[in-house]
Amino acid sequence: MEKFQSYLGLDRSQQHHFLYPLIFQEYIYVLAHDHGLTRSILLENAGYDNKSSLLIVKRLINRMYQQNHLILSVNNSKQTPFLGHNKNFYSQVMSEVSSIIMEIPLSLRLISYLERKGVVKSDNLRSIHSIFSFLEDNFSHLNYVLDILIPYPAHLEILVQALRYWIKDASSLHLLRFFLHECHNWDSLITSNSKKASSSFSKRNHRLFFFLYTSHLCEYESGFLFLRNQSSHLRSTSSGALIERIYFYGKIDHLAEVFARAFQANLWLFKDPFMHYVRYQGKSILGSKGTFLLMNKWKYYFVNFWKSYFYLWSQPGRIYINQLSNHSLDFLGYRSSVRLKPSMVRSQMLENAFIIENAIKKFETIVPIMPLIGSLAKSKFCNALGHPIGKAIWADFSDSDIIDRFGRIYRNLSHYHSGSSKKKSLYRVKYILRLSCARTLARKHKSTVRAFLKRFGSELLEEFFTEEEQVFSLTFPRVSSISRRLSRRRIWYLDIICINDLANHE
């Protein structure tokens, strides 16, 4: 963002409120292209190569200067195509660049907030595993959890209204409304469930929609974080990290006074000394030590909160109250639950010996094997029962390429699921991928698996399926006992910024 600021000539004054003229500047598109934000858009169009991408930008800007195209497109969109025959292409380019421009004031506020608060910005907070620090909390003493499905805005204007507090340029907001009403994918985005919506974000990579949805979540979470800090005896010191993940900081300070006046008389209803909250995709989990009555109050509070302040109608059935002792938390490929671990203590008093049985609550996080096998079966690595099969479409690749592909998939899955308390699921995945790789190579060489392994040796595949213990032995070469002990525990990596398709099997 420093590079953007130097090119744009923006300082901490009010200059960044006037964003609309930036759409007509060629260097904005060049910067977006260099940062890889619209690279696929500019280069995937048939008939254009890398050298002519700037020509596309020039042609687009020239068409925008001809105001008749925009006016006629709004008044009579059925007769006059928007920006010529390549309506979808040019509209997508402009929407991507517009999202970058609208992020400028938010990013500048982020920088000023970090400097004012003295917070060191870390790129590791972008890691998906930074969410899983939620599982390191002491859940064994909690009683209930709320599984919350965050509703989507029913009207597009709600998203635009949320940005009015940040962006003062009315022309940019009008252009945003134009893009939202022109896009045909938005209707399917807000009417589908969270699973389809999240997959739509990942596959279509619409930066503008992701930006708008993130701002919507920021509005919701800013108010909730304020109430959480007011109602909890244990003040949260890491709640800012939740907002930092989506690059919205100053909203907490801005909403503190507003929500203090609105909820000061009602906070006594929600006094809860132990609260644990996490959001992932379009869902969130709230854990508490409170009673069922308190959780039911939180449930109806969320419904009224969304309705009153965000004009979102949500049914109470979208929020589920579950008792943690007989319920499992499923999110992002992990399953967590509280189990009773029996323990026996032998006590001796004089000549009499006693054996005391005691059950200790233990919070375990595992990887369910059946959904993972389903993902492998969907990708044609095994059948529905988990029996490995060869990858026929890879049989034309070279041997090293085939082995590298299988090894990379296993390392990604092992890396992502390293937070599991038990490694049996990963051993099963390793078995499936190794045998599938062997059958693919045997199919290529028109041989059997046994004959192929006898000819080349099983060591050919072993080196590409690196165990976590071997990784730690390379990291700590002089302390082998520590590496073996760490490899058996839950490990969260801070370099995972996207979910592998096989890992996202919900």
UniProtKB/Swiss-Prot annotation:
What are the GO MF terms of this UniProt record? RNA binding
Q: Which GO CC terms are listed, alphabetically?
A: chloroplast
- Cite the entry's keywords alphabetically: Chloroplast, mRNA processing, Plastid, RNA-binding, tRNA processing
Name its cellular compartments. Answer: Plastid, Chloroplast
Q: Which family does it belong to?
A: Belongs to the intron maturase 2 family. MatK subfamily.
Q: Which PANTHER family match?
A: MATURASE K
The molecule here is called Maturase K
Annotated source species: Lactuca sativa (Garden lettuce)
